Each structure stands twice: as structure tokens, then as C-alpha cells.
From Swiss-Prot:
Keywords: Cytoplasm, Endoplasmic reticulum, Metal-binding, Ribonucleoprotein, Ribosomal protein, Zinc. Binds 1 zinc ion per subunit. One of its GO terms (biological process) is cytoplasmic translation. This is Small ribosomal subunit protein uS14. The lineage of its organism: Eukaryota, Metazoa, Ecdysozoa, Arthropoda, Chelicerata. Component of the 40S small ribosomal subunit. Disulfide bonds: none annotated.
């Protein structure tokens, strides 16, 4: 059994390892609210394009 069969063989159906940013595929700092599924870094970059407005 080679390492190709073992690597990433654990099922990722739930938990933080199963979700990733739809822009950069990062697992950390994920914003899931409203079904965004974008990490916080990409959200800051694309917030205006999505339609979010920064309030004072």
C-alpha cells in the first residue's frame, strides 16, 4: 500500500477540514455566514464586489 492511498484518505465530511475558501482554498479564518465560505483575507479583498459596504 503506497502513500498515494493513505494520503488524505480520512473522510472529510464535517469539521473545519471539510470546508475551504472558495477563492483561495484556505481552511483558516473562514466566514460561513450567509453561505459565503470565503476566508477573512479574501473577504477583505472582495467585500465591495460582493456588495458589502463599510460603515463609519
Amino acid at each position: 500500500m503506497g502513500h498515494e492511498n493513505i494520503w488524505y484518505s480520512h473522510p472529510r465530511k464535517y469539521g473545519p477540514g471539510s470546508r475551504y475558501c472558495r477563492v483561495c482554498a484556505n481552511h483558516h479564518g473562514l466566514i460561513r455566514k450567509y453561505g459565503l465560505n470565503i476566508c477573512r483575507r479574501c473577504f477583505r479583498q472582495y467585500a465591495a464586489d460582493i456588495g458589502f459596504k463599510k460603515l463609519d
